[in-house]
UniProtKB/Swiss-Prot annotation:
Its EC number is 2.4.2.-. Disruption phenotype: A double darT-darG deletion shows no change in growth in culture, upon infection of mice or upon exposure to a variety of stresses. Another group finds the double knockout gives a competitive advantage over wild-type cells in liquid culture growth experiments. GO terms for molecular function: DNA binding; glycosyltransferase activity; nucleotidyltransferase activity. NAD(+) binds at H30, F31, T32, G39, L47, R67. It comes from Mycobacterium tuberculosis (strain ATCC 25618 / H37Rv). Transmembrane segments: none annotated. The gene is darT. It is an enzyme of class 2 (transferase). Toxic component of the hybrid type II/IV toxin-antitoxin (TA) system DarTG, which plays a crucial role in controlling bacterial growth and bacteriophage infection. Its toxic effect is neutralized by cognate antitoxin DarG. ADP-ribosylates ssDNA, preferentially in the motif TTTW. In case of phage infection, DarT toxin ADP-ribosylates DNA, which inhibits both viral DNA and RNA synthesis and leads to abortive infection. This is DNA ADP-ribosyl transferase.
């Protein structure tokens, strides 16, 4: 499982690294608090926000509330659902929301240390026949669009921005922050067996994570990369 990544943004892919023409190779990232891993392991899956109450909440509640009311409808055959009915994965791990969580907000002030990135290859999501779609920006934003056309995904999202370190809005481009938060949304759940990459901020959290995950079995790549956080 050789991967290459853009350290500026945390955009990771198998083989030669992120390529707009090979979205199947992209590794997409769901971050959570290490406290939540026992519940995930017991369930055997990552569950949508609408179906789970985490042990330690890190999400920013105003955004969570918006996601509960954001309709996801990439096409007429997609299940009637809201953004909160999906398991969210960021295409570039160093997302604007990760910045908010690492720096602290009204609901969480624990910093980056206890956070865990769980990585899944988009191709594995597709091969598992899960219902998924991509957002071209923050899935909570009113103007965000959705697609499940994998062949055009590299142009549907802002690929170049997903490779860059800086994502703040500018006068000329007031939606950069949203586009840098492009997501892969998986409807309902993701079997934990699809998680093939685990990234932690420090050794302390990785030791805790390995103690929990090693008995579960499966093949996963474990890395400590503080640069994948803020």
């Amino acid at each position: 499982m050789i991967t290459r990544y853009k350290p500026e943004s945390g955009f990771v892919a198998r083989s030669g690294g992120p390529d707009r023409k090979r979205p199947h190779d992209w590794i997409v990232w769901h971050f959570t608090h290490a406290d939540n891993l026992p519940g995930i392991i017991t369930a055997g899956r990552l569950l949508a926000d609408s179906a789970v109450t985490p042990t330690t909440e890190v999400a920013y509640n105003p955004v969570k509330e918006l996601r509960r009311h954001k309709v996801v409808a990439p096409d007429s055959r997609y299940p009637a659902s809201m953004a909160s009915d999906h398991v969210p994965f960021y295409i570039a791990a160093r997302s604007p929301m990760l910045y908010v969580v690492c720096k602290g907000h009204s609901g969480y002030s624990g910093g980056a240390g206890p956070l865990v990135h769980l990585g899944v290859a988009l191709g594995d999501i597709i091969d598992a026949d899960l219902t998924w779609c991509a957002s071209d920006g923050n899935a909570a934003a009113s103007y965000t669009k959705f697609s499940r056309q994998v062949d055009t995904l590299g142009t549907f999202v802002d690929f170049d921005l997903l490779c860059q370190r800086q994502w703040h809005n500018t006068d000329d481009d007031p939606n950069r922050q949203s586009r840098r938060a492009a997501e892969i949304l998986v409807y309902g759940h993701v079997p934990f067996e699809l998680v093939s990459y685990v990234c932690c901020y420090n050794t302390e959290t990785m030791t805790r994570v390995r103690t929990l995950l090693d008995p579960v079995g499966g093949v996963r790549k474990y890395v400590i990369k503080p640069g994948m956080y803020y």
